[in-house]
């Protein structure tokens, strides 16, 4: 998930990153 489409980062930083 996330606007970047990067689930690896979304799980840490949230949907904003």
From Swiss-Prot:
GO biological process: neuropeptide signaling pathway
Gene Ontology cellular-component terms listed: extracellular region
PROSITE patterns: PYROKININ
InterPro entries (alphabetical): Pyrokinin_CS
Keyword presence, Cytoplasm: no
Intrachain disulfide bonds: none
Protein location: Secreted
Keywords: Amidation, Neuropeptide, Secreted
Main location: secreted
Function field: Myoactive.
Family membership noted in the UniProt record: Belongs to the pyrokinin family.
Protein name: Pyrokinin-5
Source species: Panchlora sp. (strain SR-2005)
